From Swiss-Prot:
Residues the UniProt record annotates as site (Important for catalytic activity for the proton relay mechanism but does not participate directly in the coordination of zinc atom): 148
Species of the source: Shewanella sp. (strain W3-18-1)
Listed name of the protein: L-threonine 3-dehydrogenase
Subcellular location: Cytoplasm
Gene Ontology cellular component list: cytoplasm
Gene Ontology molecular function: L-threonine 3-dehydrogenase activity; zinc ion binding
Record pathway: Amino-acid degradation; L-threonine degradation via oxydo-reductase pathway; glycine from L-threonine: step 1/2
Catalytic reaction(s) noted: L-threonine + NAD(+) = (2S)-2-amino-3-oxobutanoate + NADH + H(+)
Enzyme nomenclature, EC number: 1.1.1.103
Organism phylogeny: Bacteria, Pseudomonadati, Pseudomonadota, Gammaproteobacteria, Alteromonadales
Chain's gene name: tdh
Domain of life of the organism encoding this protein: Bacteria
Length: 341
């Protein structure tokens, strides 16, 4: 089968002929229709420090996808051949304390599809049936292929009550932009998103952000005055991993504010903890998606009218994968989709 593999311990990714994956008794075999390129895939493509420590070579990568079930393990119940599915990319152990308590997204033994095991940049993928999610008929393949990052946005955004609240999002990558759309859809008052990338900020405006702020040109505090905000933001969603962005968030949070952190700093990050203490801030770390409550919420949000389609800006056939990675690497894109049909 065709697959995109990290063949060498250097920058790049290669289109190869790989063996079809072998299915177990509790697995599904999925014929891939569309995949999306994630920021994690770009780290692997660029072979950065994290990738060098994490990714075995060779490895078929990718974890954002939609496909069709073409074979079912003999112990699997609840799925049929022909079902359209996406899937949770975190394969959990099922026996640690968190898994047994139903908190599977906090499994300490998580294995990542396309990171620790063969991924979805291929004509076929095998995953445990437990990890598969049936896609409702009224949700398109394009949207289903980005459910993984959309889930990051939904998990982060819905960590705290948003109705009538003022929300600051630092980092206008695709996940931050989708989070802005979620916040507006569920009833936040002002949703302000910050970045220095004008292309991404314009996408955020299209997706419903009240104000998309280029912090290299505008002061966040001036924007707050413009919006009539006198006390600070009630909810912060940190999506960038950039220390200066998080510091700006701490400066502008209201007393009693709540912060959800998805962005991963490049290293240790010093902060002024006195601001956290004296403001009585709550900080929550976010990893992945809640299984499977986040997935049901994703589908319900789209079915209730949330439109995240503007975040998809580029489509390529799999043979043109290099153009897709170039588009993602340019910073002048939203989500990039590769078609395997």
């Amino acid at each position: 089968m065709k697959a995109l593999s990290k063949l060498k311990a250097e920058k790049g990714i290669w289109l190869v002929d790989a063996p079809k994956p072998v299915m177990g008794h509790n697995d599904l075999l999925i014929k891939i229709k569309k995949t999306a390129i994630c920021g994690t895939d770009m780290h692997i493509y660029n072979w950065d420090e994290w990738s060098q420590k994490t990714i075995p070579v060779p490895m078929v990568v990718g974890h954002e996808y939609v496909g069709e079930v073409v074979d079912i393990g003999q112990e699997v119940r609840g799925f049929n051949i022909g079902d359209r599915v996406s899937g949770e990319g975190h394969i959990t152990c099922g026996h640690c304390r968190n898994c047994r308590a139903g908190r599977t997204h906090l499994c300490r033994n998580t294995s990542g599809v396309g990171v620790n095991r063969e991924g979805s940049f291929a004509e076929y993928l095998v995953i445990p049936a437990f990890n598969a999610f049936k896609i409702p008929d009224d949700i398109s393949d394009d949207l289903a292929s980005i459910f993984d990052p959309f889930g990051n946005a939904v998990h982060t955004a819905l960590s705290f009550d948003l109705v009538g609240e003022d929300v600051l999002i630092t980092g206008a990558g695709p996940i931050g932009i989708m989070a802005a759309a979620v916040c507006r859809h569920v009833g936040a008052r002002h949703v302000v998103i910050t970045d220095v990338n004008e292309y991404r900020l314009e996408l955020a405006r299209k997706m419903g952000a009240t104000r998309a702020v280029n912090v290299s040109k505008e002061s966040l505090k001036d924007v707050m005055k413009e919006l009539g905000m006198t006390e600070g933001f009630d909810v912060g969603l940190e999506m960038s991993g950039v220390p200066s962005a998080f510091h700006a968030m701490l400066d502008t949070m209201n007393h009693g504010g709540k912060i959800a952190m998805l962005g991963i700093p490049g290293g240790e990050m010093a902060i002024d903890w006195s601001k956290v203490i004296f403001k009585g801030l709550v900080i929550k770390g976010i990893y992945g998606r809640e299984m499977f409550e986040t997935w049901y919420k994703m589908a319900s949000l789209i079915q209730s009218g949330l439109d995240i389609s503007p975040i998809i800006t580029h489509h390529f056939k799999i043979d043109d994968f290099q153009q897709g990675f170039d588009a993602m690497g340019s910073g002048q894109s939203g989500k990039v989709i590769l078609s395997w049909d």
